Amino acid sequence: MDKKGDWLIYDKKGNVIPVAQGTDEDKSVTGNGLPKFTGSMTHNFTYKNFDLSVAFRGAAGFDIFNVHDFYFGLQSMTTNQLTTAYSKNAHITTGKNVITDYFIEPGDYLKIDNVTLGYTMNLNKKYIEKIRLFGTANNLYTFTKFT
C-alpha cells in the first residue's frame, strides 16, 4: 500500500504500480484451492467394558482466500457492535476492494472429527445378551492457521 492507503501491485514487467493503473495483462493466477494431501485416521481403544474411538481428518498444501477480511476488515474489531455488523475494512482506506494475494492464507488443517465413548453391559438375559450405551461428539476442534 502507498501512503494514501491505496493498493500497490506488480505489473507484468515486475514494476510496482498503483492498482488503478493495472490492466488485465498484469493479473496472474495465485494460490491453489485444491489440497495436495488429504487424510484421515481413526484410533480405537478398549479397556474392560469401555471403548473409545477418536477420528481425525485433515488436508494440507492448499490456500484459502479470506473473504471475511476482504469485505469486512478485521474480525477482531468489536467497537461498533451496536451500529453495524462489521468494521470498515482497515486494510483499504481509499478506492475499491481489490483482490490481491494479501488475503490468501494457508488452508492446512487437522480436525478432531469424531469422539465416541461407550460402555457395554453384559445382561445375560433371555432375549438381551448385551447392551451398549455411548455418547458421540462431532466436529470437536480444528487446528489451523487460517483466520
Over which residues does each language-model region extend?
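Extracytoplasmic gating/loop element in the C-terminal half of outer-membrane beta-barrel translocons
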Residues: 2, 15, 59-140, 146
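Outer-membrane beta-barrel transmembrane strand signature
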Residues: 1-53, 94-107, 112-114, 118-123
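A composition-driven signal for long, intrinsically disordered, charge-rich low-complexity tracts
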Residues: 35, 140-141
